[in-house]
Structure formats: C-alpha cells, structure tokens
Amino acid sequence: MAFKARVDEVLSRFVAEEADRFAGIDPLLGPVAGQLEEAVTHGKRLRAAFCYWGWRAVGQPDSDALVRAAASMELVHCAAVVHDDLIDDSPLRHGRPTAHVALRDAVRHRPHAPAAARSLAMLVGDLLMALAGQLFATSGLPAAYLARARPLWAVMARELIAGECLEILRTGTGPDTDASLKVIRYKTAKYTVEHPLLIGGALAGAGTRLCEGYSSYGLPLGEAFQLRDDLLGLFGDPARTGKANADDVVGHRPTALLAETWRLAGGDDRERLRTLLGRPGADTEALDDVRELMRALRAPDRIEDMISARVEESLGALDQLNLPPHAAAALTALARSATNRLS
C-alpha cells in the first residue's frame, strides 16, 4: 500500500473511533463529531511523510507503528487548519464549508448562532490537537523512542501558536517582507517540514549533526511551501485549491506577496493598493485589479525567485548529509512536490 494510503487509513480509522466515543456521550454532539471526521478527509500528508523519512534516513526500517506516529503530525495540521479558518473567517477548505460554517446548522435555532458555531469549531480544533498527542503516544513504538521525541512537541506547539499570533498582530499593518517571512517561518514552515523531520529523527535516535541538517533542509523548504501557498491563494484556481482566493486580500494579511508588491510599488500604485486591501466584500473586479497591479510590478516573479532560492538551499543542505540513497531520493521528491504544485 502506498504511504499516503497507509496514513489515510490510520487517520480515518482512529478518528472515526474517537468521533464515535465522543458522539456517544450525547446525541447533540453528532455534528461536532462529524467535523472531527471531516477534518481528516483531505490532505497531501506531507507532514507525515517528512516524519517518516526523518526516521528512515537514520537507517530505521519501515514500521506500521512509525506510520501511526507520523500520522499524528497530520492531526496537528488538521487542528491548526480548523483554528486558522476560524481566525481568518474563511468560508471554504478543500471546496467544502469550513468547520465554523458547517456547524451553523447545528445551532441555527439558538441565539447568536454564528458565534455558537465558531465556539464549537474552536473546540473541534482543540480536540484534534489532543487526539494528535494520543495517536502519537499509542502508536506502538517503544516508550524510550517516544520519550526522545516528546520534548519536541512542546517546541512545535509553541512555535506554531507564536506564528499564528504574529499573523494576527501583523494583519492590517504596513507590509514588510522580513516580517512576513518570520510569520511564514513560525506559522507554517517549522511544523510542516522541520518539526516532523526532527520528531522522526528523534524517534530513530538521530545524532546532533543529522538533526542540524534536517533543520537546514527543512526551514527553507517550509518557507518555500508557504510562499507557493500564498501565490496559489491569489492566482490559483479555486476549483483546484479548494479555498476562496479573496481571503488574503480582503483580510489584508501579512503575506510576502503583498509585502513585495508594496516594496516595488510607487506612490500612485500604493494608493491603489491601499484602497483595495482589507475592503469587505471585494468584488471580482477589485481582485483582478490587485492581480493586475502585482503582475505589472512583477511581484509574483519575485516570489517565484524566493521559492527557487529556498528549494536550492534546501537541496544543497540535503546533499551535505550523505543520507542513504533511498532516503535522499524521497526527500528530494518531497521538496519538489511541496513547492511545485497547483493546490
């Protein structure tokens, strides 16, 4: 069975069992339990793959227990997605209503229904994060292996939440490329590539040099992953991305794409941009104006250059590690698939 299919099977079975236990407490909890299962329905499973190859690159063999531990990285992601969609008030994810939108039906006859639905979605994300830790702890790997990796979970949570906080605090402020890259680094890059690799390595008993190499490979690659996401967020096809492509502009979010556009723009162009950013209900024409301005300033090309430079840096670091050929090939392929995509 292909790796992604193995991870999908672990997640669907584990979360279905937990959702049943949760819904068994009271019939009213059924819609909330349904969102637990909905959260794990889609995904590329990149985080699980990086954890898996962080283990395999040390010389450890394939293991069903390791696949379960690696799958827990996806539950961290699912939790982060539910919370991020809630914070950003995003209506769609994978072409389907986000949790805080879908749960409105469960509270439609109650006072302040939208706020109640948002509260339920917040708790869905909280429970998914708890389930991530449970899946990891019950993966079947020896306790000594798990103990080596457990401290990294606290680091991952701290840095992920710091990144989300930084995005909130910087939303609507003056665009700044360095500040945007810091948000990317902590909100996405670390928990997408670096931390899964380090956790896989710690489980396998990786030494200091290899762990440092994982970070040298993982950080620039994680940044490139999110830079690609930012481009797709505005220029991608919503039918492929499954997300509304107005979110970043309407929300005036601190993306590197916006920051580079601002840096390259002159006075008149900045004024045009200022009138469009953060405007509720921006129509298609307004979004097209933003895209046209960005293209005229070649801001997307600048982001493409940043992506290419980071992928090159990442693969250069990988070459220095002298990993087993199968692990090096897998991590090279993951770097390409993470950054050269349409969704």
Residue ranges and their predicted role:
Residues 288-343:
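Short hairpin/turn module used for nucleic-acid contact or packing/dimerization
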Residues 35-36, 40, 70-76, 153-160, ...:
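Short alpha-helical scaffolding segments that buttress acidic/His motifs in well-ordered protein cores
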Residues 52-56, 81, 130-138, 198-202, ...:
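Short glycine/serine- and small hydrophobic-enriched flexible loop segments
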Residues 1-78, 82-83, 87-110, 114, ...:
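Conserved N-terminal diphosphate/IPP-binding helix and adjacent helical/loop segment
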Residues 94-125, 174-190, 212, 216, ...:
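Divalent-cation-assisted or electrostatically stabilized phosphate/pyrophosphate-binding catalytic cores
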Residues 1-7, 66-72, 146-153, 211-217, ...:
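Hydrophobic packing residues in well-ordered alpha-helices of helical domains and bundles
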Residues 24-25, 39-47, 122-130, 137-238:
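All-alpha helical catalytic cores of prenyl diphosphate-utilizing isoprenoid enzymes
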